Amino acid sequence: MDLASKLFKGDRVIWVIFMFLCLVSVIEVFSATSTIAYKNANHWAPIVRHATFLLGGFVLVLLMHNIPCRFYSLLSLLLPVSMVLLAITPFVGVVVNGEPRWLEILGIRFQPSEIAKIAAIGYTAFILSKRNWFTDKQMFWYILGGVGGVCFLIFFNNGSTAILLFAVTFMMMFIGQISIGRLLRLGGAGIIGVLMLVGFIRFAPDKVIDLMPDRVHTWKARIERFSDPADAVKFEPGRAVSIDGDDYQVVHAKIALARGGLFGKFPGHGQQRDFLPQAYSDFIYAIIIEEMGIVGGVFVLLLYIILLVRVGMIARRCDKLFPKFLVLGCGLLVVVQALTNMAVAVDLIPVTGQPLPLVSRGGTSTVISCAYIGIILSVSRFGANMGNEEETPEEEAALNFIQAVKDMKARFGIGDTCLLYTSDAADDK
């Protein structure tokens, strides 16, 4: 067995997708962080920081995919811990970009919401797998209580993350065959609640909005920009327009998409990376299309689609419920977040602030995204029969036992009859 086979166990397709996404990330983040490099007067500092987090995430994948997936049921224990961290973040959190979303402990800065997401997935998978412990009604309310509490704590600082986590949990409950009636009522209440909130924020007087948390002002600006019917009129040919305010990011993202063409301008030759404030994060997909063209954009999209398809195949071949729901939850969270980021970049939905998993520049988000891949690979290795060349631990133990019997036969001259008798006796048991 060569070194690659020893290191990269589990589903080979997932490994290939992970490597490609990391490669795209290094190339595009290096290009998109040009403004940061200019401000810091250090050409290499931004990409070295990002590459360090990617390397740490890669090591984490290597470690996690060697841990049997049954141990990830312990993730559910992180849920109450993450809720405490989320509760204290608004009061003692580190303010970055005007929002206290980060905590700093022993010099390490992280986002509690990212920890809460992976804990919520593990918790939901654990509850759904215990059908012999809980009734359908109990599972529904336990999941709604635990994940709903996390979403509530996340919502006012990061509404899009709360909605994303709630949607993925809802899909997990649907796949887990929770009563369709309960899910319809929950889904209907959620949709009505979001529509009412959007309507209130959109049409409420500014005096009322001023009394609410600062984050509501950001939501209002994004909703108004997205629903502005005069958007097309402002950009008539031959008319000079000042691009600023809430239009700034979205308009420059559209320019990046328009410049990309079929094959793009080649990495490092994009222009809009110098104008988009979040070119390396929220709008990195627009930079990918500008520099790699529609071909590159479709390629990245297909990587995520294939990832979801492969996760579905792994889940279908799981004999036990916990790894099945765990791998589905991790896969859905990564892919739905990726599709959300892409939809923002092409102006299909309002700006959400969601990074592109495994591609956007980040710290906690990059490491946690790698953790999802590590869990998926662990399930493909220990929880599902994917036709890999490696044996499961049980198969390896059986083969070692058979080899030991053969060695004993050769050493003591035991005949075939005795060996056959031993095999038959084992079969009778």
Model-derived regions, located:
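N-terminal membrane topogenic signal
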Residues: 4-17
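Hydrophobic alpha-helical transmembrane segments of multi-pass inner membrane proteins, especially
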Residues: 15, 19, 26, 31, ...
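Transmembrane alpha-helices of multi-pass inner-membrane enzymes
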Residues: 23, 347-391
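Transmembrane alpha-helix interface/packing and boundary motifs in multi-pass membrane proteins
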Residues: 151-156, 262, 340, 346-355, ...
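Long extracytoplasmic/lumenal interhelical loops at the membrane interface
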Residues: 244, 249-295
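Conserved small/polar residues in nucleotide/adenosyl-binding loops
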Residues: 421-429
